[in-house]
Amino acid sequence: MARYRCCRSQSQSRCRRRRRRRCRRRRRRSVRQRRVCCRRYTVLRCRRRR
């Protein structure tokens, strides 16, 4: 749910530039890293949603 919301909030150009491989690795690190993960994970949702 958080990934989807992040994707909608982020821009498509920004979503395309982010990566989702590092997000998976830094997923259970800290609450602050969770936001970064959402921004990087957004790439996968933005690309498949559009």
Curated annotation (Swiss-Prot):
Record protein name field: Sperm protamine P1
Assembly mode: Cross-linked by interchain disulfide bonds around the DNA-helix.
A GO BP entry: chromosome condensation
The keyword Nucleus is assigned to this record: yes
Keyword list, A-Z: Chromosome, Developmental protein, Differentiation, Disulfide bond, DNA condensation, DNA-binding, Nucleosome core, Nucleus, Spermatogenesis
Tissue: Testis.
Disulfide bonds: C7-C15, C38-C46
Places the protein is found: Nucleus; Chromosome
GO function term, MF aspect, one: DNA binding
Main function: Protamines substitute for histones in the chromatin of sperm during the haploid phase of spermatogenesis. They compact sperm DNA into a highly condensed, stable and inactive complex.
Family the UniProt entry places it in: Belongs to the protamine P1 family.
Residues making up the signal peptide according to the UniProt record: none
Cellular component terms (Gene Ontology): nucleosome; nucleus
Primary location group: nucleus
